[in-house]
Regions:
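Major-groove recognition helix of helix-turn-helix-like DNA-binding domains
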Residues: 1-3
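Extended, low-complexity cationic-aromatic segments
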Residues: 17-108, 220-223, 227
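C-terminal anion-handling pockets and recognition modules
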Residues: 36-39, 167-276
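Short, conserved catalytic/metal-binding motifs centered on acidic residues
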Residues: 40-46, 80, 106, 129-134, ...
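RNase H-like polynucleotidyl transferase catalytic core
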Residues: 63-71, 148-166, 183
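Short, basic/hydrophobic alpha-helical segments
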Residues: 102-127
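RNase H-like two-metal-ion nuclease catalytic core shared by retroviral integrases
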Residues: 131-133, 140, 155-179, 187
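Short, aromatic/basic amphipathic alpha-helical patches
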Residues: 139-149
Length: 276
């Protein structure tokens, strides 16, 4: 028996695949445009004191344990924006983000990106805000804000497509860094969240953005894309993970596992035979 993964039936529907293709085409059109522009990726993620690493090391014969507070405390939500220049802005708030908090975040981001207020023109850099296509981002107040700030434009991601949003990997890596600080109360949790964000480098963000673009050809071809979030924040396909797991099980059954035996199992070839 194998572990079952829940897969939304619409995740690779014709409608979703067409929306992915349209999104990639829009990105390519912006890239081909001579007007200077920059893609900004925005999302929100929550955290509380009850969250910890689910695996750890232990002394032989003893359980691997970790101390946690007796109460989980209030959820803290962080809204963040990343680009090729790295982490541009992040704001932590107790409780969920509402319209007022999101507008305040956009205003702070606008002041950071467009310090010269009132300047407009054909050759001015445009900032493409790329985020999830959720109802919260379609509110009239948000739409009006973008109309008042023409240097920032909104681009919505297709549904069921986290592999196209590099900030998903940012939040995954950031969570592990927060776990390592082992916060014990709300104040230390806020400090750990800020410290974890500062540990994210420009190279990290650039690598995540490049990784999402590896899926563009498959979106253009309307392929079915199956993915799974792995440790370290890397989104990959189910097929690659299943091949990796089969190789581990095959080598684990051997009395004398070796690197060559593992490589042979991973490539589905007999041990000792070289690939032509």
């Amino acid at each position: 028996m194998k572990q079952l993964y829940t897969v939304p039936f619409e995740r690779n529907s014709e409608r979703v695949k067409e929306l992915r293709r349209q999104y990639v085409q829009r990105v390519m059109e912006l890239e081909a445009n001579q007007a200077p522009h920059e893609f900004i990726y925005i999302d929100e993620a929550g955290f509380n004191l009850a969250k910890r690493r689910r695996r750890g090391r232990n002394v032989i014969g003893k359980r691997a344990t970790v101390d946690v507070p007796g109460q989980r405390g209030a959820n803290i939500t962080m809204c963040a924006a990343i680009a090729n220049a790295g982490l541009l802005l992040h704001r932590c708030q107790v409780g969920p983000y509402n319209t007022e908090r999101l507008l305040a975040f956009l205003n702070d981001l606008h002041q950071r990106l467009v310090p010269e207020q009132g300047q407009e023109g054909e050759n001015m850099r445009t900032f493409v805000i790329t985020w999830d296509n959720v109802a919260f981002h379609h509110l009239q107040a948000i739409t009006t804000w973008f109309e008042v700030h023409p240097r920032l434009v909104s681009l919505f991601l297709p549904p069921y497509s986290p592999f196209l949003n590099p900030i998903e990997e940012f939040f995954s890596a950031w969570r592990w860094k927060v776990y390592d600080h082992q916060p014990h109360d709300q104040m230390s949790l806020l400090e750990a969240m800020d410290a974890g964000s500062r540990d994210i480098t420009v190279d990290d963000c650039q690598g995540w953005i490049r990784h999402t673009r590896r899926f563009y050809p498959r979106c253009i071809d309307l392929d079915n894309i199956r993915w799974l979030a792995m440790a370290g924040g890397r989104l990959t396909s189910h097929s690659g993970l299943e091949r990796y797991q089969r190789a581990l099980r095959s080598v684990g059954k051997s009395r004398r596992p070796s690197a060559s035996r593992y490589k042979a199992a991973l490539t589905n070839q007999p041990e000792g035979r070289r690939r032509s």
